[in-house]
């Protein structure tokens, strides 16, 4: 029991001693923590003092900077103000000087005006004296000549008028002669300028095309069995095909440039392809016709672009390209129109006209020639009607009429086109009259045949000694073909003059086509 009590007391004493020891240790730690906190607080306080000091320095520097800028700006403003003040002072001095000058001028004007008034007064006095003297002289004259004042005046005026009329007539004749000489000189100068600034190509059309072939064996294939291929070619193409002993050459003859060009291309393609037969001939012909239509439009577009023209209807552009396959007096129509366009532009520019409008009128002045093979009427009327339909400029229409004398030229541009047309046509070697007469005769021959009902097409071949007529098998039978040939022959004999005889050949072919499905 006592031992247990002693153990308990010992435990209590131990706990007490442990508590005291622990408390002392904790008190020591607390004191250390407090000291550390105080040290940190002092460090923070020191840093704060440094920051505050830096802030004060920054504020002071900023104040100094602002004060410096303010002083600089104030100085600049003061300087500008002083400068403006000086300028105003100078202007004020200048105004004062001008004001003084105006005062002096005003005084001078007043003196001058007074002087003029004095002079005017003297002049009036002199006039009065002169009038008095004149009256005295007139009285003396009336008394001596026994003529009144009006009668004397009439005699003097009549004499003056006679003398003046002679002088005026002499002056008018002189200036009229000078004006004519000057106009002639100016016209010659303009024409010389135009012709020297434009160098056109010489373009004379032939009536034949020569196709070169590799060997003469191809001639037999082109002729075909019993001449079937060459007959088909001539009928489809509307040309003469001459195959003779000339080595390596086939000649295509036709007065129509367009048909001749198509025929040449068709034969070249057939020779290149090697398959020469009637069906293939028609197939190639159709293909080439489409290609030529596209090429004609492209040719027209190139011409229009080269001339710097715009807003031309596509149909007119196509017809411009078609002029490449038309000729007049042996001169290519497109080459002639281009020459006229360039010359007209130069002449119009020299005379103060619209160069672009003159070129437009020049290229279109013969546009009707692209239609004469398809429509009745002169190329002048056809061209004017076409341009009127597509709303071309009135100057263009006037130029079309004026270049053949159907109307008077109403503008510089129209007159320039007329002059350029004459220059182009009159150029040595530009045209051939005999060739044009032949072309006119064969065209008339085709027109007579085409005027009959039931005719699909007609081609003048063999230099106009034969007319080949393609009849519509649906409208013309065999008996009517014979009568048709006689009628056409009789009309040709009645209306045309020609050497020898002309063969009228009416061809009627009926094709029946059906497809097995």
From Swiss-Prot:
Name of the protein in its database record: Ribonuclease Y
Gene3D superfamilies, alphabetized: Hypothetical protein af1432 (1.10.3210.10), K Homology domain, type 1 (3.30.1370.10)
HD domain sequence ranges: 333-426
Any one Gene Ontology molecular-function term assigned to this protein's record: RNA binding
Gene Ontology cellular-component terms listed: plasma membrane
InterPro entries, per database record: HD/PDEase_dom (IPR003607), HD_domain (IPR006674), HDIG_dom (IPR006675), KH_dom_type_1_sf (IPR036612), Ribonuclease_Y (IPR017705), RNase_Y_N (IPR022711)
TM segment ranges: 1-21
Statement: the UniProt record of this protein carries the keyword Cytoplasm: no
Family indicated by similarity: Belongs to the RNase Y family.
Annotated signal peptide: none
Main localization (coarse): membrane
Subcellular location, record wording: Cell membrane
Group of enzyme by EC: hydrolase
Pfam families: HD, RNase_Y_N
Domain KH intervals: 207-273
Keyword set includes Transmembrane helix: yes
EC number of this enzyme: 3.1.-.-
Keywords: Cell membrane, Endonuclease, Hydrolase, Membrane, Nuclease, RNA-binding, Transmembrane, Transmembrane helix
Record GO biological process: mRNA catabolic process
Cysteines joined through disulfide linkages: none
Function of the molecule: Endoribonuclease that initiates mRNA decay.
Membrane topology note: Single-pass membrane protein
Highest taxon in the source lineage: Bacteria
SUPFAM superfamilies (alphabetical): Eukaryotic type KH-domain (KH-domain type I), HD-domain/PDEase-like
């Amino acid at each position: 029991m006592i031992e247990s009590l002693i153990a308990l007391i010992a435990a209590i004493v131990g706990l007490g001693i442990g508590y005291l020891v622990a408390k002392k240790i904790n008190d020591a730690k607390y004191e250390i923590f407090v000291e550390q906190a105080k040290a940190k607080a002092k460090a923070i306080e020191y840093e704060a003092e440094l920051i505050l000091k830096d802030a004060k320095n920054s504020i002071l520097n900023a104040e100094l900077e602002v004060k410096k800028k303010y002083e600089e700006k104030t100085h600049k403003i003061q300087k500008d103000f002083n400068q403006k003040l000086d300028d105003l002072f100078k202007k004020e001095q200048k105004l004062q000087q001008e004001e003084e000058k105006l005062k002096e001028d005003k005084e001078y004007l007043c003196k001058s005006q007074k002087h003029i008034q004095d002079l005017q007064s003297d002049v009036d006095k002199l006039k009065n004296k002169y009038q008095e003297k004149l009256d005295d002289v007139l009285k003396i004259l009336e008394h001596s000549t026994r003529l009144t004042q009006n009668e004397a005046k009439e005699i003097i005026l009549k004499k003056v008028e006679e003398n003046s009329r002679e002088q005026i007539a002499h002056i008018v004749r002189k200036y009229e002669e000078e004006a004519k000489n000057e106009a002639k000189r100016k016209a010659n100068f303009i024409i010389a300028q135009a012709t020297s600034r434009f160098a056109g190509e010489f373009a004379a059309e032939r009536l034949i095309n020569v196709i070169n072939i590799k060997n003469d064996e191809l001639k037999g294939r082109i002729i075909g069995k019993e001449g079937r291929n060459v007959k088909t070619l001539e009928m489809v193409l509307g040309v003469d095909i001459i195959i003779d002993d000339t080595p390596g050459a086939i000649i295509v003859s036709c007065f129509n440039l367009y048909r001749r060009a198509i025929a040449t291309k068709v034969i070249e393609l057939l020779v290149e392809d090697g398959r020469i037969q009637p069906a293939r001939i028609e197939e190639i012909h159709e293909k080439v016709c489409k290609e030529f239509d596209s090429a004609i439009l492209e040719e027209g577009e190139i011409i229009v672009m080269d001339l710097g023209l715009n807003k031309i209807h596509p149909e007119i552009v196509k017809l411009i390209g078609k002029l490449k396959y038309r000729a007049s007096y042996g001169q290519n129509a497109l080459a002639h129109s281009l020459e006229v366009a360039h010359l007209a532009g130069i002449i119009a520019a020299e005379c103060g006209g619209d160069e672009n409008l003159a070129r437009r009128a020049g290229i279109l002045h013969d546009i009707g020639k692209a239609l004469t093979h398809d429509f009745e009427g002169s190329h002048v009327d056809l061209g004017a009607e076409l341009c009127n339909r597509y709303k071309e400029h009135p100057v263009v229409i006037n130029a079309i009429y004026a270049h053949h004398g159907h109307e008077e030229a109403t503008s510089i541009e129209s007159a320039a086109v007329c002059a350029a047309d004459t220059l182009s046509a009159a150029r040595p070697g530009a045209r051939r009259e005999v060739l044009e007469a032949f072309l006119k005769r064969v065209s008339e021959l085709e027109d007579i045949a085409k005027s009959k009902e039931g005719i699909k097409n007609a081609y003048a071949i063999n230099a106009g000694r034969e007319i080949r007529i393609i009849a519509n098998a649906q409208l013309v039978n065999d008996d009517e073909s014979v009568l048709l040939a006689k009628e056409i022959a009789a009309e040709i004999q009645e209306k045309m003059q020609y050497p020898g005889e002309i063969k009228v050949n009416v061809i009627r072919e009926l094709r029946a086509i059906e497809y097995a499905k």
